[in-house]
């Protein structure tokens, strides 16, 4: 697994040199999509995935996703099962995430059919394993010919990923442990605006 870390925090990671197998880029306060624009040409593997800084991706689970995609060229993306954990007073509480979608698949033969299937699915595809070609094409579409961003709202960026992934191909949730996510107060999981609000709110209407 090759790891790219485009870090937009104020201060660089002091121990980056201790990890020569990781490509580390310090880009303080740079917009998420602009960081992606820089790293897209660096992705040399056939598949790619996000791993948030409060997540623990499971290598064996990733291997199961890539094996599935190798065998199913009509699928663009796949992910497994998630577990959320919360440290509390010396103990750790665990609970499954997206339990209603343990076996979810989006298998329509056309992009329109797949988008209609996805309409009521609240489990995001953002952290799934996806084909690199699809990943690069979807994010190339986020920029105008002059290099400026078509939109800046990161809630919309996740919704854009969900739709674009299904335009490129089918999706599967596979029965493998894929990722552990720490529940942290103030994390994105607590501040993310629901899709239902994004689709109907005047605040987001123009970009949506």
Region annotations inferred by a language model:
Residues 1-200:
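Nucleotide-sugar donor-binding/catalytic module of glycosyltransferases
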Residues 200-208:
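C-terminal, non-catalytic tails of nucleotide-sugar-dependent glycosyltransferases
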């Amino acid at each position: 697994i090759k790891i790219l870390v485009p870090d937009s925090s104020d201060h660089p990671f002091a121990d980056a040199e201790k990890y020569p197998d990781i490509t580390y880029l310090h880009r303080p306060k740079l917009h998420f999509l602009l960081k992606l624009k820089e790293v897209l040409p660096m992705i040399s593997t056939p598949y790619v995935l996000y791993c948030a800084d409060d997540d623990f991706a499971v290598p064996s689970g990733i291997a199961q996703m890539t094996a599935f995609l190798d065998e199913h060229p009509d699928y663009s993306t796949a992910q497994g099962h998630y577990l959320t954990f919360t440290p509390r007073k010396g103990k750790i509480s665990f609970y499954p995430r997206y339990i209603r979608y343990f076996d979810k698949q989006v298998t329509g033969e056309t992009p329109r059919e797949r988008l209609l299937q996805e309409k009521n699915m609240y489990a995001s595809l953002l952290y799934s394993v996806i084909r690199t070609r699809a990943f690069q094409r979807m994010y190339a579409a986020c920029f105008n010919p002059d290099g400026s961003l078509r939109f800046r709202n990161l809630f919309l960026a996740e919704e854009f990923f969900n739709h674009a992934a299904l335009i490129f191909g089918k999706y599967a949730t596979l029965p493998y442990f894929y990722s552990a996510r720490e529940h942290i107060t103030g994390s994105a999981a607590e501040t993310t605006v629901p899709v239902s609000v994004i689709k109907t709110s005047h605040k987001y209407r123009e970009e949506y």
